[in-house]
C-alpha cells in the first residue's frame, strides 16, 4: 500500500538531485481549493515537495505555467478519490474475478444453474492454470496471428555482428506476438506457462514478482520467454500493466512526480519505484539504485546490490537477459508491455543506456508498447532517440483512438511530460497513422468530450456486430460489451482495453517498418 512518510525525503547522506513529489494526502480539500483558486503558497507547499535548495523557478518554465495549476489540482483530486476507493476497488476486483471464473468454469450462467441443481459446481481456484484475470475475461484470445510463421522470419537472420541486416520485424506478425505477450502478462504464472509452452510452442524462462519499496509489496510482474529452448533467435520481455481494480496502479498513472537524472532528464518517479529503483520517502535511494557503485568506499554495498537483484524488476530482468544473451549467441531481444507495463518496457532500455550496457543494447531488436503513459520530459526523449531510433526506428508506441492512458500525465508547462518514438495511431476503424504524437495529446475541452461520446456509441455498435463482420475470433462477449457501455460515461476508458489493441494489430494494414540489428 502507498504510504506517505511525513519525514519527507529522508536525511541519508548522498547525491542530492532535482525532483518534484506530488503528495495528494498531506493537505485537505480546503487546501486544494485554496491552491486551485487562489494559488495559496502555503497550501501549495503541502502538496508539492522539492529539494530544500531548489526554488520554484527551477521547476516551472515561466509565469504562464502557473495558469496550468488546475492540471495539478485535478491530478491530486483524482488520486485522493482513488485512494478513498482503494478498498472497495480491491473487494470489487476480488468478487468480479471470482464470479467471472465461476461462470466460465461451469459453462456460463445457465450452465452454472444446471450444475447447482446437479450439485456439481466447479469452484475456481486462484493461481491455477484455469483461473483467468479480468483482462483475460474481456478478451479470451490466446492464439497468435495464424498467418505468420514466426521461426521462418527469424532463422534467416545472421549474427548480430553481421552489419545492418534489415528485416521486416515491424510487420503484423511480431506486433501480434508483442501485443499478445502484453495481454498475457496480466495472468498468473501457471496460465503464462501454459500459454507460452503449450499453445505458442515456445519456452518460458522466468515469471517474476518484483519488489516496489514505496508500496512495500511485490507489485511489479514481468515474464521472459524465448522462441525455443536451444539456439534461440528471439528473447521477449513482457511487463504487466495497470490492473483494472488496482488503485495503486491507477494512482501511479495519474502521478506527476519526477526525479531528474543528470544528462538524461526528468523520469517519472512512480515508474522508477515500480522498477524497484527507489522510494520517494528517501529520494537518495534513487541515485544509489540507478548507479551501481564501484568505488572502494562502497564495497560494503555489494550485499545490498545482490539483494536488489533478487527484488528489483530492473536488476532481476537484466541478470536474466545477460545470461540468455550469453547462452544464445544469435538471439536478440524485444521488450513490450501495455499501459503501466508499456512505461516499464521503454524505461528498461533507458536504464540500460544510463548504466552504459552497450553490449546489451546492441542486441536490442525493438520495443513495442501499447497504451503507454508518458515516462519523462523532452530531454529524456532526445537522450533516447539517439540510442533507439538511429539509423532506424526500434521503438514503436501503439495508441488506439481515445485511450486516455497514453495522454497521461498531461503534457503541460509545469511538468513537461513528453512522448518520444514513432507513434502508430489507430482510429475507431482500425486505420493506421504514423506520427510523432497521437491526436489530442491533452484531452480536454468540449470538442474532445462530444467527439469522445460519439465514438463510444460507434464502438458499442461495432462491438455488437464484429462477430458477424469479421468472424468468430472478433466476437465480443457480454462482459466486453458491458465495459463498452462504461465508455459512454467515461470516453477513453473502454479504449484502453486490450481488445482494441489486438484488433488494431490484426485488422490494421501490414506494416512495412524496418528494424536493423545495428
Curated annotation (Swiss-Prot):
Keyword set includes Cytoplasm: no
Listed result of changing residue 339 to A: Loss of catalytic activity; reduces pollen tube growth
Sorted UniProt keywords: Hydrolase, Lipid degradation, Lipid droplet, Lipid metabolism, Membrane, Transmembrane, Transmembrane helix
Biophysicochemical property: pH dependence: Optimum pH is 5.5.
Keyword Membrane: yes
Record note on disruption phenotype: Reduced pollen tube growth.
Membrane topology according to the record: Single-pass membrane protein
Distribution of this protein across tissues and organs: Expressed in pollen grains, pollen tubes, developing embryos, developing seeds and germinating seeds.
EC class (word): hydrolase
Membrane-spanning intervals of the chain: 93-113
Gene Ontology CC terms: lipid droplet; membrane; pollen tube
Function (record text): Acid lipase that can hydrolyze a range of triacylglycerols without a clear preference for acyl-chains. Can also cleave 1,2-diacylglycerol, 1,3-diacylglycerol and 1-monoacylglycerol, but not phosphatidylcholine, phosphatidylethanolamine, or sterol esters. Required for pollen tube growth. Triacylglycerol hydrolysis by OBL1 may provide acyl groups for the synthesis of membrane lipids in growing pollen tubes.
Name of the protein in question: Triacylglycerol lipase OBL1
Organism: Arabidopsis thaliana (Mouse-ear cress)
The organism's taxonomic lineage, starting at the top: Eukaryota, Viridiplantae, Streptophyta, Embryophyta, Tracheophyta
Gene behind the chain: OBL1
Amino acid at each position: 500500500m502507498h504510504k506517505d512518510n511525513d519525514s519527507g525525503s529522508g536525511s541519508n547522506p548522498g547525491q542530492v538531485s532535482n525532483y518534484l513529489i506530488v503528495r495528494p494526502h498531506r493537505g485537505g480539500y480546503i487546501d486544494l481549493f485554496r491552491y486551485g483558486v487562489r494559488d495559496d503558497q502555503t497550501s501549495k507547499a503541502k502538496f508539492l515537495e522539492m529539494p530544500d535548495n531548489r526554488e520554484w523557478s527551477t521547476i516551472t518554465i515561466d509565469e504562464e505555467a502557473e495558469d496550468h495549476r488546475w492540471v495539478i489540482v485535478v491530478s491530486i483530486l483524482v488520486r485522493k478519490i482513488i485512494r478513498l476507493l482503494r478498498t472497495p476497488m480491491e473487494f470489487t476486483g476480488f468478487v468480479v474475478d471470482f464470479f467471472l471464473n465461476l461462470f466460465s468454469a461451469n459453462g456460463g450462467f445457465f450452465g452454472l444453474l444446471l450444475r447447482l441443481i446437479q450439485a456439481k459446481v466447479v469452484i475456481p481456484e486462484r493461481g491455477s492454470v484455469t483461473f483467468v484475470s479480468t483482462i483475460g475475461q474481456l478478451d479470451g484470445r490466446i492464439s497468435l496471428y495464424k498467418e505468420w510463421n514466426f521461426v521462418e522470419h527469424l532463422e534467416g537472420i545472421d549474427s548480430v555482428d553481421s552489419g545492418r541486416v534489415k528485416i521486416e520485424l515491424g510487420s503484423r506478425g511480431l506486433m501480434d506476438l508483442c501485443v499478445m505477450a502484453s495481454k498475457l502478462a496480466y495472468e498468473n504464472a501457471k496460465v503464462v506457462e501454459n500459454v507460452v509452452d503449450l499453445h505458442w510452442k515456445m519456452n518460458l524462462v522466468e515469471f517474476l514478482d518484483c519488489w516496489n519499496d514505496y508500496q512495500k509489496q511485490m507489485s511489479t510482474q514481468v515474464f521472459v520467454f524465448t522462441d525455443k529452448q536451444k539456439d534461440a533467435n528471439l528473447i521477449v520481455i513482457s511487463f504487466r500493466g495497470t490492473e483494472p481494480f488496482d488503485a495503486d496502479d491507477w494512482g501511479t498513472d495519474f502521478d506527476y512526480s519526477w526525479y531528474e537524472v543528470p544528462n538524461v532528464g526528468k523520469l517519472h518517479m512512480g515508474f522508477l519505484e515500480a522498477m524497484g529503483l527507489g522510494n520517494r520517502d528517501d529520494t537518495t535511494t534513487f541515485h544509489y539504485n540507478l548507479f551501481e557503485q564501484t568505488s572502494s568506499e562502497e564495497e560494503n554495498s555489494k550485499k545490498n546490490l545482490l539483494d536488489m537483484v533478487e527484488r528489483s524488476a530492473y536488476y532481476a530482468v537484466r541478470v536474466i537477459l545477460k545470461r540468455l544473451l550469453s547462452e544464445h549467441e544469435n538471439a536478440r531481444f524485444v521488450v513490450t508491455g501495455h499501459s503501466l507495463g508499456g512505461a516499464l518496457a521503454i524505461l528498461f532500455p533507458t536504464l540500460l543506456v544510463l548504466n552504459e550496457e552497450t553490449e546489451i543494447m546492441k542486441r536490442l531488436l525493438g520495443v513495442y508498447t501499447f497504451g503507454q503513459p508518458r515516462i519523462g520530459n523532452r530531454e529524456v526523449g532526445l537522450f533516447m532517440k539517439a540510442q533507439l531510433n538511429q539509423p532506424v526506428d526500434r521503438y514503436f508506441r501503439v495508441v488506439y483512438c481515445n485511450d486516455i492512458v497514453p495522454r497521461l500525465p498531461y503534457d503541460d508547462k509545469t511538468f513537461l511530460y513528453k512522448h518520444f518514438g514513432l507513434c502508430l495511431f489507430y482510429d475507431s476503424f482500425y486505420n493506421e497513422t504514423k506520427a510523432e504524437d497521437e491526436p489530442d495529446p491533452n484531452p480536454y475541452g468540449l470538442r474532445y468530450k462530444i467527439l469522445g461520446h460519439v465514438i463510444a456509441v460507434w464502438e458499442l455498435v461495432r462491438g455488437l456486430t464484429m462477430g458477424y463482420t469479421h468472424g468468430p475470433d472478433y466476437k465480443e462477449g457480454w462482459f466486453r460489451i458491458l465495459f463498452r457501455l462504461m465508455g459512454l460515461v467515461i470516453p477513453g476508458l473502454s479504449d484502453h482495453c486490450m481488445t482494441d489493441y489486438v484488433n488494431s494489430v490484426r485488422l490494421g494494414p501490414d506494416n512495412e517498418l524496418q528494424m536493423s540489428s545495428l
